[in-house]
Amino acid sequence: MEEIQRYLQPDRSQQHNFLYPLIFQEYIYALAHDHGLNRNRSILLENPSYNNKFSLLIVKRLITRMYQQNHFLISTNDSNKNSFLGCNKSLYSQMISEGFAFIVEIPFSLRLISSLSSFEGKKIFKSHNLRSIHSTFPFLEDNFSHLNYVLDILIPYPVHLEILVQTLRYWVKDASSLHLLRFFLHEYWNLNSLITSKKPGYSFSKKNQRFFFFLYNSYVYECESTFVFLRNQSSHLRSTSFGALLERIYFYGKIERLVEVFAKDFQVTLWLFKDPFMHYVRYQGKSILASKGTFLLMNKWKFYLVNFWQCHFYLCFPTGRIHINQLSNHSRDFMGYLSSVRLNPSMLRSQMLENSFLINNAIKKFDTLVPIIPLIGSLAKANFCTVLGHPISKPVWSDLSDSDIIDRFGRICRNLFHYYSGSSKKKTLYRIKYILRLSCARTLARKHKSTVRTFLKRSGSELLEEFLTSEEQVLSLTFPRASSSLWGVYRSRIWYLDIFCIHDLANYQ
């Protein structure tokens, strides 16, 4: 039991009283602002407006106000007035939330460094760019030959603000920072402004995404740490963490090791977790749990998770938020893809003496397809085509130079191919490329007051080369006449680690 208690109390940050003074440093807000600019890149928008009002002068004014300690005292007689933020309440609150989120991530970064240093003699790649979206890649590439059912889970919300603060108490041993967090949440925010429940999953306030993502990830980590603990104590393939919570979840690598289930008090529950063929992944506000068990076993999982969230987090969690689906008959919108299980048939010939046998074996594998209708809808919303997919010109870009117009269209096309490089079939992407190329040609023809045919004859191959993807460019230079290599690119699935920056596709509903 002592080992269980040690596991349930993970290796928290041991730093004390060093975070709060950073809230008064100007460079913290500058770093947080630059980080936000780098994270808010867009595919279809060339100049996303992150925060045009940021300036060091406003930061100095904010820090001056924070130095006046009496403004942090909550007065019961004057609760409706807010002399601390003044007339710039929205801007100041956004800056405080960004700066605070940047500061409280420091203990997690320190824990990441310590976890990486524990691997002696192993070369670990720099994982500061890892996000939970990257954990979906091995999930989509896994072999699901023995899996039958899948649990589609909507992670419960809303969580009480005080529970979020108490969760951070185990990570951030800085009472002043926690008091500031509690004051900030209860004085300037309510839960409805941070989360909206109009759509399935989570919809975060656009002005304070990083701040609430951090709180939300802390809460989800508490859920998943207990879940992983129960899984580890019963599985013959024990999971060992090799990265720290950066922005979403843990990443786990499996090693073969027989473990003894010593937790006698958990024997009634642990028998549910003895299935070694189990796959779990989380993306945004959803979780997916696949298992080879029967429908009865998955139903027990469902009620266990409901009771866990209700008892541990005091949440009213209806059972309708967890759906049990048969893996072979269910498709889902997942990470911007339309995912379903595809059966890959394979024929084996076996010969014993004079007799030969043909063995037909079907392997289950996730098939990731490009959702053509939502993608054309996004292009139509950005005025690249009609809702039916017919290319149109973009008049707002007609004042730009020819090279800028071609560069913008080409960059959008390459970004789309870059994000959907994990697709099993890329035929849809070439249709999108056709729409963008013709839209670019129509825009240029409109600018020069000529027809599309005339402009294409004059431009030659220059317009075609601008829309080549990075893989096609490499193959065209290496194997200029090898069409089979291009066919291999068409069929292969490639996952890039930087696709989490592309918010238009990763977060579309």
Swiss-Prot record:
Coiled coil keyword on record: no
Keywords: Chloroplast, mRNA processing, Plastid, RNA-binding, tRNA processing
GO biological processes: mRNA processing; RNA splicing; tRNA processing
One term of GO molecular function: RNA binding
One Pfam family linked to the record: MatK_N
Family: Belongs to the intron maturase 2 family. MatK subfamily.
Cited function: Usually encoded in the trnK tRNA gene intron. Probably assists in splicing its own and other chloroplast group II introns.
UniProt name for this protein: Maturase K
Organism: Nicotiana glutinosa
Gene for this chain: matK
